[in-house]
Amino acid sequence: MNAIHCVGRTEPWQYVEDAPIPQIKDDEVLIEIKACGICGTDHSLHRGQEALFNSYDITFPAIFGHEFSGVIAELGANAPKNLEVGMRVTANPVLFDNTCPYCDKGMVNICDNRPFYGTDLPG
């Protein structure tokens, strides 16, 4: 798979043609990315803006990019039945645990334990 790696704060971005394809779990979906934006958050993290950088758990090399669209390439055994391989999709990059007080109130966007694709997790 192709990817843009950020190898370190303020280091040049690197284009990688042979990045490993993630292995999915039974309840996950693999999306073949067709388009991905690099937004202000990505640039701020790359520049090392302290307040923003310290709010994420970033390991380098990082694959930024949380604004994306693509097609479903693979479905886990327990993926939702309304999804199909080849379907065009986008996704919310925020994961949530459904156990914290915010999730209980439906405010999953501020979950206490929310990893984020493109920052905490590879984009």
Language model segments and positions:
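Cys/His-rich zinc-coordinating "finger/knuckle" motifs
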Residues: 46, 107-110, 118
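Short N-terminal binding/cap micro-motifs at the start of the first secondary-structure element
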Residues: 10-15, 40-41
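Cys/His-coordinated zinc-binding microdomains
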Residues: 104, 115
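Short Gly/aromatic-enriched secondary-structure transition segments
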Residues: 45-51
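Short, solvent-exposed secondary-structure boundary/capping segments
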Residues: 43, 82, 111-114
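Residue-level recognition of beta-strand termini and adjacent short loop/turns
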Residues: 8-10, 25
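Glycine-rich beta-strand-centered segment in the early N-terminal region that forms part
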Residues: 21-36, 51-101, 109, 120-121
